Amino acid sequence: MIRFVLQKIKNKKWLTTCLLLGLVFLVAAVSCQPMFKAGSLNKMLLDSFHNAGEEAEAYPTVIGRTGAYVTEKRQTAAAVLDGVKGYQQTWEKYLGSIKAVNTQTILTLDEQSAQGAYGGKGKYLRVSYMPDMLAHTQVLVGEDYDAYAENLYGCMLSESVMDACGFTVGETLEFPLWTDAGGETLKLQICGIFKETDSTDTFWYTAPNTMEQEMFVSEETFDAIVKQFAPEKINYATNVLLDYTKINQKNVADVQYYIEQFHKEDESFTDSFLNLLKQYQKDKKTIDITLWVLELPLLGLVLAFIYMVTGQIIDTEQGEIAMMRSRGYRRSQIVALYALQACILCLVAMLIGTPLGYGLCKLAASTTDFLTFHAGNLSMYHFTPVMLVYGLAASAVGILFILIPVVIHSGVSIVQQKSDQKINKKMFWEKYFLDIVLLGVSIYLLHNFNQEIDKIRARALLGAKMDPLIFLDSVLFIVAMGLVVLRLLHYLVQLVYHIGRKKWRPAVYASFLQITRNFRKQGFISVFLILTVAMGLFNANAARTINQNYENRIRYADGADIRLQETWKMQAFYVSANDIDYNYVEPDPVKYDEPVKQGLCTSMAKVIRTNNISVSRGKTKIANCEFMGIHTKDFGETAYLQEELNRDVHWYTYLNELAQQENGVILSKNLAAALEVKVGDVVDCSRYGDSVMKKETVRGTISGKVVAVVDAWPGFVQYTYEDGEETEHYLIVANYAKTVQSFKISPYEIWYKLADGVDSDAVRAVIDASGTKLSAYTALDRDIDAMKETAMIRITNGMFTLSFVIALILCMIGFLIYWISSIRQRELLFGVYRAMGLSEKEINRMLVNEHLFSTLPSILAGGACGGVATYLFVRLFGVIYLPQKHNLSIYVYLDQMDVLKLVAVLMVMILLCIVILRRLVRSLNITQALKLGEE
C-alpha cells in the first residue's frame, strides 16, 4: 500500500507539492505560536522590570526584611548577621535559580541625640555597621575606619550627613544621653567623609545620600559599643537584589507564589516587585487571547487552502476512486489509503514546518510596523519543545481537512460520477444564502459592540482580558461580505454575458461561457483571492491605525522632541518664627543654547510647569491645575500639536492672542466650563508653596484675562489613569515674564526641537558633557521606539504581517493551481476551438478576458471588503488598544504606502502567474489537441 501511495504522490507531484506546502505553512503557523508567546511574555516581563527600575531610579527586584534582635540573645554583629543569613537562605531555598546579584545589610542601634565638639547642629544619629562597605566606597576627606588609630571610636559619615549637620573630619561627636555603667558618655570621632565608588553599583540599593542619620563604624567598634553601653536591641535591614533576568514565563508563577507565602508567613518581609508580577498575570491572559485571535484568520485561510488543493486532487482522481469502488473497495479502505498519504505528507511537513515556524517567529518578532522589519534583540525568542506538540496537533487537523473531501467522494460510483458531471450544482452557501445570514449576524454583533463601547473601554482600563469575539466578528464580516460580493459578481458577469451574447466575438463568448459554467470551481479561488486582499488591506489599516494613534498620543503628551529639567537648589529662610520662605537658585542657562549653536536643534524654549496652582473666579475654585509659563514665540517654534487639532483654528492664533496681552491666560475647555468663564473674563491664578512651606501659603497670584479657550495643548494630558481610576486635569497658560514677575523665578523645563536627521542621544551627550544634573528627561524618539518594542505592539504587527505574507504565498500558489489545472483540463477544448478556426492570439485573448472578469473583480472586491471592514471595525480595535479618554480622538489611518505595498505585491503575483500560464499554453501539444478536436 505504501508503494501505491508513493506512486500516487509521484503521479500528482505538482498538486501534492502544493498540498505539502499548505501543510508546511499550517505546521509553521501553529508551531511558532508557543515560541512567539514565550518570547513576548519574557520580553514583557523584562520590560516591566526595566521600566519600574527607571521610574523608581532603583533596582526593581528586591526582597528583604527589617527587624531587631535583643542583645541578651545576640550581642555581636556577627551573631545578628547569622540570624539574617538564616532568612536569606530560606528565601534562596525556595526561589531556586533566582540568585542574588547583591545584598545590602545594615545594622543600627537606636538613634540618639548627638552634639558636635565644633558647634555643629545637634541631631539624632544612629551608630551603624554595614558589612563589605569599604569595598564600595570612596573616602573624600580623611580616612576610613579601618585605618583609624586614635583612642576614641572612629566613624565615617556620608556627604549628606556632613552637609545637614555641618560636621567636619576630626570632630568628636558626643551622645550625652547614652552612658555606660560607669556614667561615661559615648564619644565618636569622625575619621572620614565618604561617597559610593560607583553610583550604578547594585550594592548601594539604599544610597549614601539618602542615609541622613547613619554613622558607620567597623564591626569591632560596633561590638565594643554594644558591649560597653548595652543597648536593648540591634536593628537590622537587609535587602537582597535578585537577578530579574532569570525570572521568565516558566517560573514567574512560582516566584509570585513564594513571594506571597513569604508575606503570609512573615509580616516583616518586604519586596519591591510583587505588584509587577500580579500585573504580568493579567497581561498574560490578554496576550494569550490576542495571539490566538490574530492567528485564527490565518489558520482559517491555510485550512481552506488545504481543503481546496485536496478538492483539486480528488477532482482529478474521481474516476480512479469510482473504479476502485466498482472493483469492491470499501469506503474505509479508500479513506485509509488517503489517510496514509496524508500522514506521509504531514511527517514531511513536520520536518520542514517546525524550522520554518522558528524562522517565521523571528520574522514576526522583528516587525516594528506592518511589513516593516528591524533586526533588534531577538534573543528571548528561542526554540521550545512545546512547538513539536503544537506541530503534531496542526498535522492532525490538517489530516482531518484532507479527509473531509475524501469521505464525501469515496462513496461515488462510476454511474454517479458521470451523472454528477452533467449537473452544475450551486455551492452550499450560495444555495441556502449562508453569506447573507453571516453578514447579518456580523452587523448585529458590531451594532452591539458599538452600543457597549463605554463598557468595553471600562473593562480594558481595569485590565480585564479583551473579548475575542470583537476580533472574530471582523473576520466573520470580511468572509461574509466576500461571499456576498462574489455572489453579486456572478450575477454581474451573467448580466454582461446576456447583454452582449449575440454581439461577442467567439473568443469573448467562449470566455464568458467558461466563467458562467464553472462558477463553482472558480468560486473557491475567487473567495480565497478576495479574502487575501481584504484581510491584507484590513490588517495593514488596523496595524497602521493602532501604531499611529499610539505614536500620536506619545507625541502629544511629550509636546516636543526633547524635554528636560535640571536639578535646582532651593535656599530656604525664616521670615518669622513660624513662617518659611525660599528662593530657587537658577543654574547657568547658557549651556542650554549649546545644542542650538551646534545645529543639533532648530529651537529651544523655557517652560515653567507646575501643578501646585489653583484657579478661581468668584466662589468657584479649582485646585491642582496644571500651569505653563511660556515665551510665545519660542514655544510656538519648538512645541508640536497634531494637524488634526488645528483644523478649525490653528493654535498659533492662540499664541498670538496671548503675546498681545501681558496678563493674558489660556484655559483648557474643561477648566473654562468648570469656572463658567469665556474669552474676556478675568480669573485669579494662585501658586502655592513647595515642599518646605505650608501648602496653604500663597506664593503669588496672577489676575489673568482669558484670551483663549482650547481643547488641546502641547504636553497637556487631560485624563490620566491609575488602577482603572480616572483623574481629570485642568490647564492654564500664561506669559513667562508675567509668571516670573508674580511667582518669582522657579524651576523650568527646557524644550528642544531637533534638526532633521538628528536623534535625541546627540543632544543628551551635549547636556551630559556640560555636567548638568537632570531631575527629569523625556525624548520623543526614545518613547516611540519603546512603544514599538512593547510586547502587545510587536504581537499585533508581527501577526498581521505574518498572516499577510503566508496568505499571499498561498494565494499565489492557489491561483496557479486553479489556472494550471483549468488549462490542462481544457487542452482538448482548446484543440476544438483551434479546429473551429480560433487563432492562438484569440485563445490568449480568451484567457485574458477570463482574468478581467474573474481575477480583477475579485481583487477589487477584496479591496472594497477590506475598506468597508476598516471603516466599521478599526476604530473599535483602537478603543481596545487605547481605551483611555484623550484629547486626541482615535483616527483611522489609510496609509497610501501600505496600499501601494499591497498592490505591488499583488501585481507581481499576477504577472508572475500570467507569465507561467503563457509558457504553459505555449507548451501544450496543440497539434495533437487539434487532431483530437477535428476528430
Region locations from a protein language model:
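N-terminal Sec/SRP start-transfer signal
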Residues: M1-A28, P34-M35, D420-L438, L486-V533, ...
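Short cytosolic juxtamembrane segments of multi-pass membrane proteins
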Residues: L378, S410-W429, Q884, R919-E935
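Juxtamembrane segments of multi-pass membrane proteins
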Residues: K455-F471, V475-T653, K669
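Membrane transport/envelope proteins' first extracytoplasmic loop
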Residues: M1-L303, Q312, S366-L371, L378, ...
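Alpha-helical membrane-protein architecture signal
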Residues: I2, S332-A336, L340, K426, ...
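C-terminal transmembrane helical bundles of large multi-pass transporters
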Residues: Y748-I750, T772-R875, L882-S889, C913-I916, ...
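Interfacial "coupling" helices/loops that link adjacent transmembrane helices in transporter permeases
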Residues: K12, A304-L345, V412-F428, D435, ...
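Small-residue-rich transmembrane alpha-helices
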Residues: Y307-T310, G319, C343-A375, P385-I414, ...
